[in-house]
């Protein structure tokens, strides 16, 4: 009907053993003994929009995950124009925001700036996350170092377009948000259809950035990675590009492989 308003009201909740899964999307996993799921159901009675907020709790990593499922329960088509999986508000405090940018041959450069009034936004419109900007943000208290101070992280488990934001309002309150890239995004949600927003992994440390990184390392290594090499030493791969660039032929590649074998490269 042309309106962009949505008045979501609380309808109920469930607490389940184990970590929720996301059909068709990568997500952190967890068995019944190591994780719990909280489902919070919200509904707009007029538009028929129903939203289920999904929280996954993994205490041993100090990690909480967030996703959401949006359902259209009415006959009209609803167009989704913006969809974020996580949003945190910080009522008081002065913070810095840390993000990582890059390009070819210079990936993942560290950038830390004070959060000022207005909206700080990074993202990707390419359809991929890439090394131009990582789908990852850290909000730290002023003065936080590797070993001391409070900090919060959001990591988007999605390799497509994304948008991450940190905003300070007129009262000095800060908001941190992670979700899908809204530019050129308009998804028609038909009657009974469910739209699942990719997952954001959140963690907190009061002992500096090193502990924050370690929380994510342990969670991703043990509860996100899959496959036969999980928990094992990986085979070593020789990189012919750095060795030869464009100056190679069959003979030079065979010589490189023979020398690599002598060094124990599989």
List each language-model region with its residue ranges.
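Polysaccharide-binding surfaces and accessory modules of carbohydrate-active proteins
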Residues: 1-167, 183
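Active-site beta-loop-alpha junctions enriched in small/polar residues
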Residues: 83, 159, 201-202, 238-243
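Short Pro-Gly-centered flexible turn/kink motifs
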Residues: 6, 187-206
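An acidic-aromatic substrate-binding cleft motif
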Residues: 215-266
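Conserved mixed alpha/beta catalytic, RNA-binding, or beta-rich assembly cores of soluble enzyme
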Residues: 166, 180, 207-209
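Conserved, mostly hydrophobic/aromatic
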Residues: 68, 192-193, 238, 260
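Short, Lys/Arg- and Gly-enriched loop/turn segments at beta-strand edges
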Residues: 203-215
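Short acidic, Pro/Gly- and aromatic-enriched capping/linker segments at domain boundaries
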Residues: 172-190
């Amino acid at each position: 009907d042309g309106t962009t308003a949505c008045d979501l009201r609380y309808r109920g909740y469930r607490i389940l053993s184990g970590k929720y899964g996301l059909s068709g999307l990568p997500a952190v996993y967890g068995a019944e003994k190591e994780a719990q799921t909280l489902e919070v159901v919200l509904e707009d009675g007029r538009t028929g929009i129903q939203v289920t907020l999904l929280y996954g709790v993994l205490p041993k990593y100090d990690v909480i995950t967030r996703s959401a499922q949006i359902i259209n329960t009415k006959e009209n088509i609803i167009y989704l124009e913006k969809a974020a999986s996580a949003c945190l508000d910080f009522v008081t405090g002065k913070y810095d925001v840390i993000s990582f940018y890059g390009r070819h041959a210079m990936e993942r450069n560290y950038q830390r700036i004070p959060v000022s009034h207005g909206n700080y936004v990074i993202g990707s419109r390419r359809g991929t996350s890439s090394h131009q900007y990582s789908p990852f943000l850290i909000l730290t208290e002023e003065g936080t170092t590797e070993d001391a101070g409070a900090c919060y992280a959001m990591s988007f488990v999605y390799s497509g377009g994304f948008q991450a934001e940190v905003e300070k309002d007129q009262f000095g309150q800060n908001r941190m948000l992670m979700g899908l890239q809204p530019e050129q995004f308009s998804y028609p949600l038909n009657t009974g259809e469910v739209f699942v927003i990719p997952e954001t992994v959140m963690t907190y440390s009061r002992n500096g950035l090193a502990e924050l990184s370690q929380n994510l390392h342990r969670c991703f290594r043990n509860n996100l990675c899959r496959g036969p090499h999980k928990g094992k030493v990986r085979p070593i791969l020789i990189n012919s590009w750095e060795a030869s660039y464009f100056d190679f032929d069959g003979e030079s590649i065979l010589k490189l492989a023979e020398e690599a074998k002598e060094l124990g490269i599989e």
